[in-house]
Curated annotation (Swiss-Prot):
Organism lineage string: Archaea, Methanobacteriati, Methanobacteriota, Thermococci, Thermococcales
Protein name: S-adenosylmethionine decarboxylase proenzyme
Reactions mediated catalytically: S-adenosyl-L-methionine + H(+) = S-adenosyl 3-(methylsulfanyl)propylamine + CO2
Source species of the chain: Pyrococcus horikoshii (strain ATCC 700860 / DSM 12428 / JCM 9974 / NBRC 100139 / OT-3)
Active site: residue positions: S63 (schiff-base intermediate with substrate), H68 (proton acceptor), C83 (proton donor)
Gene, per the UniProt record: speH
This protein's UniProt keywords: Autocatalytic cleavage, Decarboxylase, Lyase, Polyamine biosynthesis, Pyruvate, S-adenosyl-L-methionine, Schiff base, Spermidine biosynthesis, Zymogen
Amino acid sequence: MDTIGHHYIVEAAGCDPNVIGDANKIREIFLEAAKRGNMEVKASYFFKFSPMGVSGVVIVAESHISVHTWPEKGYAALDVYTCGENADPEKAVDYILEQFKAQYAHVSEIKRGIEEEDRTFTHTILTWEERLDRRNGKP
């Protein structure tokens, strides 16, 4: 089944508020995640809300990595979308969750742009949950 893109939608919980509340730290994490996922960075923008929370995006040649955070809840809404065959969005997601020190992740992988016989497009969705123990240095 050929697909134009892979879109990961991640609900990350139990994240370190000091990490997900720091726009500069998230930018560093996303730039490294793009590198690890074999993505070519084109631009980035991050905004720190008052009193807390960050929204940001890294535009990559293959599509984007974006986030909205709620440090007071330890929650981050993460999106990683890539097109093409060379990028590895799952590596980027894994690295971001590790750096956010997420305790839990609900992940949906959407295979987008699946061409139908009548030249329309559809998608498939695979969803899973992971309990993570990252705060104690365990993967």
